[in-house]
Curated annotation (Swiss-Prot):
InterPro entries: ATP-NAD_kinase_N, ATP-NAD_kinase_PpnK-typ_C, NAD/diacylglycerol_kinase_sf, NADK
GO process terms (BP): NAD metabolic process; NADP biosynthetic process
Annotated compartments: Cytoplasm
Name assigned to this protein: NAD kinase
Gene label: nadK
GO cellular component, one term: cytoplasm
Organism: Burkholderia thailandensis (strain ATCC 700388 / DSM 13276 / CCUG 48851 / CIP 106301 / E264)
Amino acid sequence: MKIGHQFHTVALVGRSNTPGIAEPLASLAACIAKRGFEVVFEADTAQALGSTGYPALTPAEIGARADVAVVLGGDGTMLGIGRQLAPYKTPLIGINHGRLGFITDIPASDMQEVVPMMLAGSYEREERTLLEARIVRNNEPIYHALAFNDVVVNRSGFSGMAELRVSVDGRFMYNQRSDGLIVATPTGSTAYALSSQGPILHPQLQGIVLVPIAPHALSNRPIVLPDDSKIAIQIIGGRDVNVNFDMQSFTALELNDTIEVRRSKHTVPFLHPVGYSYYATLRKKLHWNEHPSNEEDDE
């Protein structure tokens, strides 16, 4: 068993628009408070649930006051609060109340048993990297954003291919005609990048992966770069091109706009139950190691 720091103040964050989430959140809050921990709620979560009987704090207030945030929802909920709490180094515990759950790894059915043990110091800790991006137009930055999973440049559904000029560390890599380009962290390598035939990067691997989306030339392949790389993507052709960050914020781009992407100085601490295995998560979520059907055996 790995014993870490015991926490005192615990923030609860939920996917507030999800039906049926109020009861498990209230139950978890009572379970944690009963064991002597101070409980606070993220403000939007508290507002959606109505009166919780606990203090309601903004993400900035959680960062300043809470020792740890427990997130009940899907991966999207974890991504959103992770970006907001990244400057404060607030550790996150993820409880899966969504569908896939690559980064919310505790089943909701186990939370009342597992979470109190973790809050008491029995957990495994890892740091996850983020990307920071800015859009430059006419030599002036017009937009900044953090991304936990990925920065995605893509065309709209009814426009033609985007034409992109990609440089790394000031050196020209290629011009690409495609539906877009994904710049992903190791965490994001199991998201959109994976569905576009990108490689899986272990979360502790120091890398950034570039994955073309439906490229015109079959020779355009994914590439893994060192995570200190500085990536520049210039729009040199196409129309209705957009950029999104974790699929949660979107910005329209113009011809000659440049998206500059690099590793953020911030990392997000993830806490896992003792015995956590990333490979077990992959095996379960991607259905690895499943046996052939009996029908195949009978042939």
